[in-house]
Amino acid sequence: MKKTVYTKFILAYFLFALFGFLVVATFISRAVTNLVTETEAQNLYKEAIYIADTYASDLYTSETSLETVKKQLDSLDIYLNSTLWIINPSGLIVLSSDMPIDVDNPVTVEGFSSADNAEHYYRIGTFYNSFEENVLSVIAPITNDFQVLGYVVIHKNISDIVDLSSKILNISYYLLIILFVLS
């Protein structure tokens, strides 16, 4: 009798460990990735709005030069670990933090449509095949007198978001191990 109760207890303990691992690996993993993605998108959107209201707006109202705004974008590129673009409504890249200023050879985002971004302020993908890997792209309008002059677009590699999610998920695994050891 004593031996079967002990065996059942050990079996229940291992089942609890297995189900705990499965819950962390599936539900918690997805929840953490979604949370990190949403948080990063919100933070980048705040930055994009700030850029649209200051540097980019000044560029379109001729209060500053391309070079000045380019320096600001380059600094923010390093700070945010992201690629920043200023594009016009037809998809022409006016400035990019990862390309030098070259007005003679403009680059256009093929297929860009501002209507695609009407429902959500961010998207995950290759941004109209502009990148080889998936990125989190946040877009904010540059406006003046209620007219859209262009857009600030910030792209962050999904691999950076996945790395951060994995680090947070590792904490869940450590807590699960501690729970099993203490029980």
Task: Cite the ranges covered by each PLM segment.
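Selective recognition of signaling/oligomerization transmembrane alpha-helices
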Residues: L169-S183
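Hydrophobic beta-strand positions
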Residues: I86, F127, P141-I142
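Helix-start (N-cap) segments at beta->loop->alpha junctions
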Residues: T143-D145, V153-Y173
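A short, hydrophobic, proline-anchored segment that marks a local hinge/packing element in signaling
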Residues: L136-F146
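Juxtamembrane segments flanking the first transmembrane helix
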Residues: M1-L92, D98-I101, D163, N170
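Short beta->alpha transition motifs characteristic of CBS
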Residues: S96-I101, I154-I158
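Extracytoplasmic/periplasmic sensor domains and loops in membrane signaling proteins
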Residues: K70, S97-E133
